[in-house]
Swiss-Prot record:
GO terms for biological process: hydrogen peroxide catabolic process. This is Hemoglobin subunit delta. The modification Phosphoserine is found at S50. The keyword Isomerase does not apply. Residues 2-146 form the Globin domain. Belongs to the globin family. GO terms for molecular function: haptoglobin binding; heme binding; hemoglobin alpha binding; metal ion binding; organic acid binding; oxygen binding; oxygen carrier activity; peroxidase activity. Transmembrane segments: none annotated. The gene is HBD. Keywords: Heme, Iron, Metal-binding, Oxygen transport, Phosphoprotein, Transport.
Length: 146
């Protein structure tokens, strides 16, 4: 992902304020509510029958935290996202058979959650930088599919 120095600074500054536990759970939960077909990958998580059930599900929250932990690792290696996400790409492609479009959807949901959580601090410039990052991460996660 090519980010300018200002974009890298903006991403790092905002990310340093992110509560990975909360934002991860909210982002994954919203993905499952807004795009209900993604729930098929999480049938073992139990109750996903309503928005309230999804958003309150401790397994959704725990996995969201794990997902955002991996995303944080990616932020530390923006110049090598394919390498950083190679194992996760292989897992999601070969074993879990996740549609790679879901990575793009989750990235966009994450941007929405960040905007909701940071309000005016999430300026259009910050959003543009994060859109580049989530697109790069989605591409890296989809790498094994090609």
């Amino acid at each position: 992902v090519h980010l300018t120095g200002d974009e890298k600074s903006a991403v790092a500054a905002l990310w340093s304020k992110v509560n990975v536990d909360e934002v991860g759970g909210e982002a994954l939960g919203r993905l499952l509510v807004v795009y209900p077909w993604t729930q098929r990958f999480f049938e073992s998580f139990g109750a996903l029958s309503s928005a309230d059930a999804v958003m309150g599900n401790p397994k959704v929250k725990a996995h969201g935290k794990k997902v955002l932990g991996a995303f944080s690792d990616g932020l530390a290696h923006l110049d090598n996202l394919k390498g950083t996400f190679a194992q996760l790409s292989e897992l999601h492609c070969d074993k879990l058979h996740v549609d790679p479009e879901n990575f793009r959807l989750l990235g966009n949901v994450l941007v929405c959650v960040l905007a909701r959580n940071f309000g005016k601090e999430f300026t259009p410039q910050v959003q543009a930088a994060f859109q580049k990052v989530v697109a790069g991460v989605a591409t890296a996660l989809a790498h094994k599919y090609h």
